[in-house]
Amino acid sequence: MEKEKLTDVPLHQIQIKDAFWDKYIRLVKDVILPYQWNTLNDNVKDAAPSHCIKNFKIAAGEAEGDFEGAVFQDTDVAKWLEAVAFTLDSSGRDETVSYTHLTLPTIR
């Protein structure tokens, strides 16, 4: 049996046009990503601080202080950036871009 050769499809060529999924794609873009941004920056009232962005700023020399939180918390920022990148590529640029402009220079 011959194996079928698979090829990559650029993400911008993929469009999800379905009423069921559209609702969730909009929810991620309009509600979840901004909420997560606030969580990563310790701006959610009554939520335990994550120290994620603060730790990156300390490591980059942009802020003073000591590392706080779990050693694996940098992955939260990486996962958030991946979700933002997917959202931007599939729905176009919007206010979410400003969050990445604030984050990317720090983690370089």
What are these regions (language model features)?
Residues W21, K79-E95:
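Well-ordered alpha-helical scaffold segments within catalytic/enzyme domains
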Residues Q73-E82, I107:
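Residue-level signal for functionally critical sites in structured catalytic/ligand-binding pockets
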